[in-house]
Amino acid sequence: MSATLINVDDGDAMEPTLQSILDQRSLRWIFVGGKGGVGKTTTSCSLAIQLAKVRRSVLLISTDPAHNLSDAFSQKFGKEARLIDGFENLSAMEIDPNGSIQDLLAGQGEGDAGADMGGMGGMMQDLAFAIPGIDEAMSFAEVLKQVKSLSYETIIFDTAPTGHTLRFLQFPSVLEKALAKVSQLSNQYGPLLNGFLGSNGTLPNGQNLNEMMEKLETLRATISEVNTQFKDERLTTFVCVCIPEFLSLYETERMIQELASYGIDTHSIVVNQLLFPKPGSDCEQCTARRRMQKKYLEQIEELYDEFNVVKMPLLVEEVRGKERLERFSEMLVTPFVPPS
């Protein structure tokens, strides 16, 4: 996977690398997303490797049900953060964004607001199920549990295809509104419930109503804080990944518009799988495809002239394993130069 690399300085032009993300020390949340099959996981893994060089601790999280992180690093990951082999400050975990609310409401240990939601009374579970989007949104609490307890400096999300990603980014708002509603109902009907429960306020399953509401309020405050951080460009950014084809470009534009409506910063696009036929090549298919790619690449550059557009080559070998990912990651910060 050899590539010639050079430093480029185009004056006022946006730098065609992700170096600005590495340089922005304030960034805490980085999302990597795009249409399926465009190289999101390879890009997110490579970006995580580069960030690990300049950050104290980095956590890479997959929210894609396909869970390709394990394949990319040739190492099994689960819902608990685990150090990636060969790194001292880069960890990874895979969560299911469509996880069942029952799993998350089941007891998950002590010491954290999200985890302590376990043991909820049946009444509160019924209330939670009635809130639209809560089933997926509760999986976000699993992320908060890990992030809050382990204090990573930077968190990178390897997201699911576009539609799922946009829903996932709404989860903090969904949870915040849901928990606020639960709190409101508790305030309205709390005195009535306490009349039935008695002086100790104990639910039939042994859970204390007042303690449960305090835990919910703590979780709501945490989620509210994260929701605010997602909309702060100093703390959060989204890296769009695409290939130079019509559908991928269309999905990228839709995603950028949606992100803008959520107030989430995005100023970087990684264009993968670019063909660079060797001079004098008689491969007609390669030349024709390069011509098509060039057309869409020009559209990307015209539409997103204020973005960092990173151009990544189509490689002859699969990018799997630490060494190949490290080599690929270098092209995110130093532009690839096609053979002349």
From Swiss-Prot:
Domain of life of the source: Eukaryota
Residues involved in Zn(2+) binding: 283, 286
Residue positions of the active site: 64
Localisation per UniProt entry: Cytoplasm; Endoplasmic reticulum
GO CC annotations, alphabetized: GET complex
Gene Ontology biological process terms from the UniProt entry: tail-anchored membrane protein insertion into ER membrane
Keyword entries, A-Z: ATP-binding, Cytoplasm, Endoplasmic reticulum, Hydrolase, Metal-binding, Nucleotide-binding, Transport, Zinc
Residues binding ATP: 35-42, 245, 272
Pfam families found in the cross-reference section: ArsA_ATPase (PF02374)
EC number in record: 3.6.-.-
Keyword Nucleotidyltransferase found: no
GO molecular function, one term: ATP hydrolysis activity
Major localisation: cytoplasm
Keyword Zinc: yes
Main function: ATPase required for the post-translational delivery of tail-anchored (TA) proteins to the endoplasmic reticulum. Recognizes and selectively binds the transmembrane domain of TA proteins in the cytosol. This complex then targets to the endoplasmic reticulum by membrane-bound receptors, where the tail-anchored protein is released for insertion. This process is regulated by ATP binding and hydrolysis. ATP binding drives the homodimer towards the closed dimer state, facilitating recognition of newly synthesized TA membrane proteins. ATP hydrolysis is required for insertion.
Subunit comment: Homodimer.
PANTHER family named in the record: ARSENICAL PUMP-DRIVING ATPASE ARSENITE-TRANSLOCATING ATPASE, ATPASE GET3
Family indicated by similarity: Belongs to the arsA ATPase family.
NCBIfam families found in the cross-reference section: GET3_arsA_TRC40 (TIGR00345)
Name the record gives this protein: ATPase GET3
Source organism of the structure: Chaetomium globosum (strain ATCC 6205 / CBS 148.51 / DSM 1962 / NBRC 6347 / NRRL 1970)
Gene label: GET3
